[in-house]
C-alpha cells in the first residue's frame, strides 16, 4: 500500500530533521560533517553534529538502557528509559531524542539518573503480567535484563480493577500476540510504516487505553512482517510457529546465509539436535542491514518435511529404496545402455545449488564430452541473451547499498517486493528520504513506493528511454536501471538487452564512471551468479536444442518439463521430493543449505558461505561428494578428493571466488558493451508483455513449497483472513507438497 504524498513530505520538514539526523540508518552526505565535542562521565567524546546523545554515549563505551530507540528506526522517545543527567538542565533528558551540543557535560550513572530510570521501570512493570515462565521471550528479553538492575523488589501500584488487560490480536499465521505484555514502545509500528510499507499496523486510543494492532482483524500484509518479532523488546510479539518449542540456552547457534532468494541475507541458524528450530537475521549493513524476509525466517519447517533420506530407484513405475551402491550401479548401467554421445548428456542445476556442486557437475559433464549445461527456468534452457563472460553483465553493479545514492531508478521486468524483499525496503528507504523518481516497465504490483508505470513490453521500454523518463535518467547524477528475471525469461530478451545496452553506452558519462555503474541485473535465485562465474551455462542455441538421452537434475525443480524428452533417463539429486523427484528414474538424497558448508555468490557479486548447522538426515550425502562418487562409477574420476581441492578448482576457473565477503569490481566494462549491444544487434521483438516471474511469494522453491507455515501464509494471503486453513476445501493450490484434503 502506498504512503500518501503528505506522509512522504513530512520526512523533509524541519519537524523531523533532528530525528533524521539522529538515525544512523538515514545519514548520507558527501562532505564530512562538523564534529561536536562533549564530556560523558568525565570522558571527552567527539561526534558528528546532529547525532543523538545516546549515540555519543555508545561511542564513549557507555551502554544506555532503551526500549523504543533503535538505530534503524525513526526516533519516538516513548519509553523514557534512556534518561541521562545533563549539567545545567533541570531534569533528566531522553538521550535518544536529545541532539548533542558543544560542551555538554553528561552523567549516565548519577544517583539522579538511576532514580529516574527506576521510576520509569516501575511504571513499565505496573501493568506487566508475570508471564516470564511461559513467555517465549524469556532468556532474551530486554525487560527482564533491565529490571534486574532498575526494578524494585516490590510494587506500589494497587488498583481495585487489577492490572490492565488487553485482548490479543490475530495478525496472521506468523506473529503471535500477547498484548498484555506490550509496553507501547511502537518499534513495530515504526518498522511496519517506515521500513516495510505496511501501514495496517498502528496504535489506537491514548493513555492507559492505548493499544497496538491492525484495528480490523487482518494479516499484516508485508513480506518483512517477521522482523517485528526481533524488534519487540518484550514478549508482546513472538513467533507463532516457534511458540513453546525451545529456550534460547538450549539452542546451538550457527552463522550462515540465506539462499531462498538472490540477496544472500546474513542469518543465524538456531538448532537442537538435527532440527532447525528458528532462523534469525545477522547484522550486515551492506547486504540486509538487520532484516530478513518472512520466507527466510519461517520456511525452515520445510527442511523436515518431504525430505529425501535414502536413494530411490524406480521399478515398474514405483520408487523402491536402495543402497548407494545399488543406485550408483543402476546409473552406470543406464549410461552404458543408452550410450549418450557428447551433448546428449544434459545437466540442469537448480536455484539452491552451491558453487562447489556446480563445478563438480560441470567437470563431470565435460569429462563425459558434454557442454549441455542449463539452469532451471520455466522459459527453457536457451543461452542467456546478454552473455555471461563479463561480471558486469549479470550482477547488481551499483551494489545493494548503492540504492541509497540513486536519484532515478528504472525497473525493467522485475517485482523487487517478491524477488528481493529486503532490497525493496532499500528502495523504499531512499524514496522516502529523497526526491527519488521510479519508473516501471512490466506488470505492476502492490508496491511500497510510488512509481510511474511506463508500459509492459519492449516498445514501451523504447518509448520510455526516448521520452521524458529517459531524459530524467540522462540528467541524473546516479541513475540506475534494474533488469529483472522477467526479462531473462522472456522471448524478447535479446531486444530488451540491446535497447538497455545502447542507452547505457550512449549515456556512459553518468552511467559508467569510476565511482558508479548504473546497469544492474537483479538475480532472483541464489545459484545464478555463481553459475555464471564458473561458466555453468550452455554456450550456444544449437547445443541447447540437442535432444538429451540422459538428464541429470541437480536440485532442479523449476524446469520446463517439455524440454525433457519422455524417453530420457532422469537422475534427480536433491534434498526434497519436489517436482524433479516426481519425474526421475533414480533419486539421490543430497544436503540442504543448513546441512553443508557451501559457497554462494549473491546478486551483487559478493562471495559468501553457508555453514553446516545440523547433520545430514538418513543416508543423505553432500552433493559434490555424490558427484565425485558417480564419476568413479562412470569411469571418469574427478580429480579432487576433498573440499579444499575442489575449492582450488573453483578459484582456478574464477579467481573472484577466493575473496569472501568482498565484491570484486568488474575490470572490463567496455567488453560488457560488446555483449549487451553487438551480440544482440538487430534483435526483433514480438512486443509480448513482460510477465510476473513469481506468482506466489511463499512457494518459490522446494523448501518453501514443503513448508506448512508457508502454506498457511499463502492461504491467508489469498483470502485476506488470518484464520484461513490451507487444508480446507478450495485451497488445493495453497497446500505444501504432498498434502491432501480432509477425507481424501
UniProtKB/Swiss-Prot annotation:
Cofactor(s) listed in the protein's UniProt record: [2Fe-2S] cluster; [4Fe-4S] cluster
Pfam families: Fer2_4, Fer4_NDSU1, Fer4_Nqo3, Molybdopterin, NADH-G_4Fe-4S_3, NADH_dhqG_C
Residue positions binding [4Fe-4S] cluster 1: 128, 132, 135, 141
SUPFAM superfamilies in UniProt: 2Fe-2S ferredoxin-like (SSF54292), 4Fe-4S ferredoxins (SSF54862), Formate dehydrogenase/DMSO reductase, domains 1-3 (SSF53706)
Any single Gene Ontology cellular-component annotation: mitochondrial inner membrane
Cofactor binding note of this UniProt entry: Binds 1 [2Fe-2S] cluster per subunit.
Residue ranges of every copy of the 4Fe-4S Mo/W bis-MGD-type domain listed in the record: 251-307
Domain 4Fe-4S His(Cys)3-ligated-type: 112-151
Domain 2Fe-2S ferredoxin-type: 34-112
Annotated SMART domains: NADH-G_4Fe-4S_3
Keywords from the named record: 2Fe-2S, 4Fe-4S, Electron transport, Iron, Iron-sulfur, Membrane, Metal-binding, Mitochondrion, Mitochondrion inner membrane, NAD, Oxidoreductase, Respiratory chain, Transit peptide, Translocase, Transport, Ubiquinone
CDD domains from the UniProt entry: fer2, MopB_Res-Cmplx1_Nad11
One GO term of the biological process aspect: ATP synthesis coupled electron transport
Binding site for [2Fe-2S] cluster: 68, 79, 82, 96
Biased composition (Polar residues): 1-10
Subcellular location per the Swiss-Prot or TrEMBL entry: Mitochondrion inner membrane
UniProt binding sites for [4Fe-4S] cluster 2: 182, 185, 188, 232
Highest taxon in the source lineage: Eukaryota
Entry GO MF terms: 2 iron, 2 sulfur cluster binding; 4 iron, 4 sulfur cluster binding; metal ion binding; NADH dehydrogenase (ubiquinone) activity
Catalytic activity entry: a ubiquinone + NADH + 5 H(+)(in) = a ubiquinol + NAD(+) + 4 H(+)(out)
Function of the protein: Core subunit of the mitochondrial membrane respiratory chain NADH dehydrogenase (Complex I) that is believed to belong to the minimal assembly required for catalysis. Complex I functions in the transfer of electrons from NADH to the respiratory chain. The immediate electron acceptor for the enzyme is believed to be ubiquinone. This is the largest subunit of complex I and it is a component of the iron-sulfur (IP) fragment of the enzyme. It may form part of the active site crevice where NADH is oxidized.
Oligomeric and partner information: Complex I is composed of about 40 different subunits.
Similarity section: Belongs to the complex I 75 kDa subunit family.
UniProt protein name: NADH-ubiquinone oxidoreductase 78 kDa subunit, mitochondrial
Provenance organism: Neurospora crassa (strain ATCC 24698 / 74-OR23-1A / CBS 708.71 / DSM 1257 / FGSC 987)
Organism lineage: Eukaryota, Fungi, Dikarya, Ascomycota, Pezizomycotina
Underlying gene: nuo78
Amino acid at each position: 500500500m502506498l504512503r500518501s504524498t503528505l506522509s512522504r513530505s513530512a520526512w523533509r520538514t524541519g519537524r523531523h530533521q533532528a530525528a533524521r539526523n539522529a538515525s544512523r540508518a538515514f545519514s548520507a552526505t558527501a562532505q564530512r560533517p562538523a564534529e561536536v565535542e562533549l564530556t560523558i562521565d568525565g570522558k571527552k567524546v567527539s561526534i558528528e553534529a546532529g547525532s543523538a546523545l545516546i549515540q555519543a554515549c555508545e561511542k564513549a563505551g557507555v551502554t544506555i538502557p532503551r526500549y523504543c530507540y533503535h538505530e534503524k528506526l525513526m526516533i519516538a522517545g516513548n519509553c523514557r528509559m534512556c534518561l541521562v543527567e545533563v549539567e545545567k538542565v533541570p531534569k533528566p533528558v531522553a538521550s535518544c531524542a536529545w541532539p548533542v551540543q558543544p560542551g555538554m557535560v553528561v552523567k549516565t550513572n548519577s544517583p539522579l539518573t538511576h532514580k529516574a530510570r527506576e521510576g520509569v521501570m516501575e511504571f513499565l512493570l505496573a501493568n506487566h503480567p508475570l508471564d516470564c515462565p511461559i513467555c517465549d521471550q524469556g532468556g532474551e528479553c530486554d525487560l527482564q535484563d533491565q529490571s534486574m538492575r532498575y526494578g524494585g523488589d516490590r510494587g506500589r501500584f494497587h488498583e481495585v480493577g487489577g492490572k490492565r488487560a488487553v485482548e490479543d490480536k490475530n495478525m496472521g499465521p506468523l506473529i503471535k500476540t500477547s498484548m498484555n505484555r506490550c509496553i507501547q514502545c511502537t518499534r513495530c509500528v515504526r518498522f511496519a510504516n517506515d521500513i516495510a510499507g505496511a501501514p495496517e499496523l498502528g496504535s489506537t486510543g491514548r493513555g492507559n487505553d492505548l493499544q497496538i494492532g491492525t484495528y480490523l482483524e487482518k494479516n499484516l500484509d508485508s513480506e518483512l512482517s517477521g522482523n517485528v518479532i526481533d524488534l519487540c523488546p518484550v514478549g508482546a510479539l513472538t513467533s507463532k510457529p516457534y511458540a513453546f518449542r525451545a529456550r534460547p540456552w538450549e539452542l546451538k547457534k550457527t552463522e550462515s546465509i540465506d539462499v531462498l532468494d538472490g540477496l544472500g541475507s546474513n542469518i543465524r541458524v538456531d538448532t537442537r539436535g538435527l532440527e532447525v528450530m528458528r532462523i534469525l537475521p545477522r547484522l550486515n549493513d551492506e547486504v540486509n542491514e538487520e532484516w530478513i524476509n518472512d520466507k527466510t525466517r519461517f520456511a525452515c519447517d520445510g527442511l523436515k518435511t518431504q525430505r529425501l533420506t535414502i536413494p530411490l530407484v524406480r521399478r515398474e513405475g514405483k520408487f523402491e529404496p536402495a543402497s548407494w551402491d545399488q543406485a550408483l550401479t543402476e546409473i552406470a548401467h543406464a549410461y552404458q545402455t543408452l550410450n549418450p554421445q557428447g551433448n546428449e548428456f544434459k545437466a540442469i542445476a537448480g536455484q539452491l545449488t552451491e558453487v562447489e556442486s556446480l563445478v563438480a557437475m560441470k567437470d563431470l559433464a565435460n569429462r563425459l564430452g558434454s557442454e549441455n549445461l542449463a539452469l532451471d527456468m520455466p522459459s527453457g534452457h536457451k543461452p542467456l541473451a546478454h552473455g555471461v563472460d563479463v561480471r558486469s553483465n549479470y550482477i547488481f553493479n551499483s551494489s545493494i547499498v548503492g540504492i541509497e545514492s540513486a536519484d532515478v531508478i528504472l525497473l525493467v521486468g522485475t517485482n523487487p517486493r517478491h524477488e528481493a524483499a529486503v532490497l525493496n525496503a532499500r528502495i523504499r528507504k531512499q524514496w522516502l528520504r529523497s526526491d527519488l523518481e521510479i519508473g516501471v516497465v512490466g506488470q505492476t504490483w502492490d508496491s511500497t513506493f510510488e512509481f510511474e508505470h511506463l508500459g509492459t513490453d519492449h516498445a514501451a521500454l523504447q518509448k520510455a528511454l526516448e521520452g521524458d523518463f529517459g531524459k530524467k535518467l540522462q540528467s541524473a547524477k546516479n541513475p540506475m536501471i534494474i533488469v529483472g528475471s522477467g526479462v531473462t525469461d522472456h522471448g524478447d530478451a535479446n531486444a530488451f538487452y540491446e535497447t538497455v545496452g545502447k542507452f547505457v553506452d550512449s549515456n556512459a558519462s553518468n552511467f559508467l564512471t569510476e565511482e558508479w555503474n548504473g546497469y544492474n541485473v537483479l538475480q532472483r535465485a541464489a545459484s545464478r551468479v555463481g553459475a555464471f562465474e564458473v561458466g555453468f551455462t550452455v554456450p550456444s542455441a544449437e547445443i541447447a536444442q540437442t535432444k538429451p538421452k540422459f538428464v541429470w537434475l541437480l536440485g532442479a525443480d523449476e524446469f520446463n518439463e517439455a524440454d525433457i524428452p519422455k524417453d530420457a533417463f532422469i537422475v534427480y539429486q536433491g534434498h526434497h521430493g519436489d517436482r524433479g523427484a516426481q519425474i526421475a528414474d533414480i533419486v539421490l538424497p543430497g544436503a540442504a543449505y543448513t546441512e553443508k558448508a557451501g559457497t554462494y555468490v549473491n546478486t551483487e557479486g559478493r562471495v559468501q558461505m553457508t555453514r553446516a548447522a545440523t547433520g545430514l538426515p538418513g543416508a543423505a550425502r553432500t552433493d559434490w561428494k555424490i558427484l565425485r562418487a558417480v564419476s568413479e562409477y562412470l569411469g571418469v574420476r574427478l580429480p579432487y578428493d576433498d573440499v579444499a581441492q575442489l575449492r582450488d578448482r573453483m578459484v582456478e576457473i574464477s579467481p573472484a571466488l577466493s575473496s569472501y565477503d568482498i565484491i570484486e569490481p568488474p575490470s572490463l566494462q567496455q567488453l560488457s558493451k560488446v555483449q549487451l549491444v553487438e551480440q544482440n544487434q538487430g534483435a526483433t521483438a514480438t512486443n509480448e508483455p513482460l510477465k510476473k516471474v513469481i506468482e506466489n511469494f511463499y512457494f518459490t522453491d522446494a523448501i518453501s513449497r514443503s513448508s506448512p507455515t508457508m502454506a498457511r501464509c499463502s492461504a491467508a494471503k489469498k483470502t485476506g483472513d488470518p484464520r484461513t486453513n490451507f487444508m480446507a476445501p478450495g485451497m488445493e493450490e495453497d497446500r505444501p507438497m504432498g498434502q491432501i484434503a480432509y477425507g481424501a
